[in-house]
Curated annotation (Swiss-Prot):
Superkingdom per UniProt: Eukaryota
Annotated protein name in UniProt: POC1 centriolar protein homolog A
Localization per record: Cytoplasm, Cytoskeleton
Record-linked Gene3D superfamilies: YVTN repeat-like/Quinoprotein amine dehydrogenase
Record-linked InterPro entries: G-protein_beta_WD-40_rep (IPR020472), WD40/YVTN_repeat-like_dom_sf (IPR015943), WD40_repeat_CS (IPR019775), WD40_repeat_dom_sf (IPR036322), WD40_rpt (IPR001680), WDR55_POC1 (IPR050505)
Compositionally biased spans, kind Basic and acidic residues: 331-340, 348-361, 371-380
Keywords carried by this UniProt record: Coiled coil, Cytoplasm, Cytoskeleton, Repeat, WD repeat
Family affiliation: Belongs to the WD repeat POC1 family.
Region (Disordered): 323-380
CDD domains to which the protein is assigned, alphabetical: WD40
Repeat positions for WD: 16-55, 58-97, 100-139, 142-181, 184-223, 226-265, 268-307
Organism: Xenopus tropicalis
Length: 441
């Protein structure tokens, strides 16, 4: 059982926003979670069950991006009101504000050393600032449409940006030059980020795809077509071996990057999932959606071999366009397929949550080469038949899971109505007793 991963499970379920949740991020100490919303509010959720959440008000329009500093002492938020705010994540909610752009600020991100900020805007520019006193340093200006996202590389030497001009640009922070443009997306790119090793980038796009490039060779090495809707956000597991994606199709997808396949499909949000983020240690991930909810999930699937996986997080050997399983311990490479079990946490109204994890045999679109090209045609046909059968079974299981979720919701509504009737009856009895009492002199 040592190499057998467990299924992700729902841990917490937060309600408090009054409109679509657009962005989420964990405090590096994993004790707090920040979320921004179209309701213009920043919420700080405390992971301890009994601690109250903080609502920070200051932005005049929707918050589109939040990011904790590496120290956890500050939170940066970017807004449609064209400003960036730096908040202290305490009960006082103190903040400083600066006008960052002449258009909507869609993205804000700290550098790895916590000394710099990078912002991206509808004014078609990317700007870099000092955190101390929010001093403007320089601007990157080659995009010809809105810039939706910008991130520092882990070592802080590079910046990656994604724009509605359908390009992803890689910038050298020192020379301030664009060193490469990736133009292989059929749609707009909503989100882009660096792999923890700094050797690759992944992008989420409106053409329902997720693509991974090796930035040393400027080569597309993985191409996933697993969503049926626009992909809004993604997050790398800190080990670098997993990628989680959030989509308008109401699902989260967990991808195994080493084996190039889909691991899990998670159902929980009612409507588009707009944001997803792993915690700094990878133990949890959070998601936000148009249903105004924030969900925290326990990763689980990395627990059995996390220590081993970290050993293989080498800057020069991962995702080199060759053998995707080169960094996986031999015991884990050919583990048998299994059906993942549905798991729910009984915390903060979990009856609204429905989570299923699909079988891992779901086909992926490869760009580098087909992993089955060496098999005879007959065997290949058999494999396709088996895969088709498994997909059908998984589809039926998914329908059953959804049905159970609906039944649970109906049962919960019945329980709530019954409790309300009992409360009303008790109140009526109490009033009746008080009315029959005669005053004593």
């Amino acid at each position: 059982m040592a190499g057998q991963p467990e299924d992700p499970s729902l841990e917490r379920h937060f309600k408090g926003h009054r409109d679509t949740v657009t962005t989420v991020d964990f405090n590096p100490n994993t004790k707090q979670l920040a979320s921004g919303s179209m309701d213009s509010c920043l919420m700080i959720w405390n992971m301890k069950p009994q601690m109250r959440a903080y609502r920070f008000v200051g932005h005049k329009d929707a918050i589109l991006s939040v990011d904790f500093s590496p120290s956890g002492h500050l939170i940066a938020s970017a807004s449609r009101d064209k400003t960036v705010r730096l908040w202290v994540p305490s009960v006082k909610g103190e903040s400083t504000v600066f006008k960052a752009h002449t258009g909507t600020v869609r993205s804000v991100s700290f550098s790895g050393d916590g000394q710099s900020l990078v912002t991206a805007s509808d004014d078609k520019t990317i700007k870099v600032w000092t955190v101390h006193r929010q001093k403007f340093l320089f601007s990157l200006n080659q995009h010809i449409n809105w810039v939706r996202c910008a991130k520092f590389s882990p070592d802080g030497r590079l910046i990656v940006s994604a724009s509605d001009d359908k390009t992803i640009k890689l910038w050298d922070k020192t020379s301030r030059e664009c060193i490469h443009s990736f133009c292989e997306h059929g749609g707009f790119v909503n989100f882009v980020d660096f792999h923890p090793s700094g050797t690759c980038i992944a992008a989420a796009a409106t053409d329902n795809t997720v693509k991974v490039w090796d930035i040393r060779m400027n080569k597309l090495i993985q191409h996933y077509q697993v969503h049926s809707g626009v992909v809004n956000s993604l997050s790398f597991h800190p080990s670098g071996n997993y990628l989680i994606t959030a989509s308008n199709d109401s699902t989260l997808k967990v991808l195994d990057l080493l084996e190039g396949r889909l691991l899990y499909t998670l159902h929980g949000h009612q409507g588009p999932v707009t944001s997803v983020k792993f915690s700094r240690e990878g133990e949890f991930f959070a998601s936000g959606g148009s249903d105004e909810q924030v969900m925290v999930w326990k990763t689980n699937f990395d627990s059995a071999s996390y220590a081993d996986l970290l050993k293989y997080r080498q800057h020069d050997q991962f995702l080199n366009g060759g053998d995707y399983t080169s960094g996986v311990p031999a015991a884990d490479r050919h583990r048998p397929e299994r059906n993942a079990q549905t798991d729910q946490a009984d915390d903060l109204e979990p009856r609204h949550i429905q989570m299923s994890a699909k079988d891992r045999s779901s086909p992926l679109s490869y760009t580098s080469r087909s992993i089955d090209q060496h098999h005879p045609q007959a065997e290949d046909g058999n494999l396709r038949t088996v895969a088709s059968t498994l997909e059908h079974i998984v589809g039926q299981l998914d329908i059953l899971t959804r049905t159970v979720g609906i039944l649970e919701q109906r049962l919960s509504l019945t329980e709530d109505k019954l409790k309300e009737c009992i409360d009303n009856q008790q109140a009526t009895v109490s009033l009746s007793h008080s009315a029959t009492k005669t005053p004593s002199f």
